[in-house]
Structures are given as C-alpha cells and as structure tokens.
C-alpha cells in the first residue's frame, strides 16, 4: 500500500523514474533521493515498473530504470 501513517486528509501522488547502471534498487533510490530535494513529508513509495536498456552487441544490461510513485501530504 502506498499511503501509510497518513496524518493529512489529502495525499498527493507523484510518479518518478530513476536510472542507474548498478541495479533497479539503486535506480529507485536515485528517484527517491531526488524527490526528497523538493518534496517534503514523503510517507511512502510504490514501485510501478522496472525496465532496462540492453547493449545489442553484448547482451548486457547497460542501464536499469525504476518507476516509482511517492505519496506525501498536502500542506496548507
């Protein structure tokens, strides 16, 4: 569940995509770290999808991408 311990009556959901050459978990962390720079009060996240870019010559993954949704309460 995306919204946990919600103290606000209204939550905003924002979708972000992070990327990494290390893995999907690192890509999610990149997205969350960037979100915390401009969004206050993030209460949870949900992983929506995981994708990757593959080098056609080697068959190796060159970039991992994780799409997440973050929830936060609206301030008045």
Each model region followed by its residue ranges:
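Solvent-exposed beta-strand sheet faces enriched in polar/charged residues
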Residues: 46-48
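A cross-kingdom feature marking charged/low-complexity
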Residues: 50-76
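Alpha-helical assembly-interface signal, strongest on the long, hydrophobic N-terminal helix that forms
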Residues: 2-8
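Short, well-ordered alpha-helical segments
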Residues: 8-44
């Amino acid at each position: 569940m995306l919204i946990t311990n919600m103290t606000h009556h209204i939550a905003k959901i924002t979708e972000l995509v992070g990327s990494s050459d290390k893995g999907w978990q690192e890509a999610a962390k990149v997205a969350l770290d960037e979100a915390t720079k401009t969004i206050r009060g993030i209460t949870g996240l949900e992983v929506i999808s995981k994708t990757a870019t593959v080098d056609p010559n080697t068959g190796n993954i060159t970039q991992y991408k994780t799409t997440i949704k973050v929830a936060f309460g609206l301030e008045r």
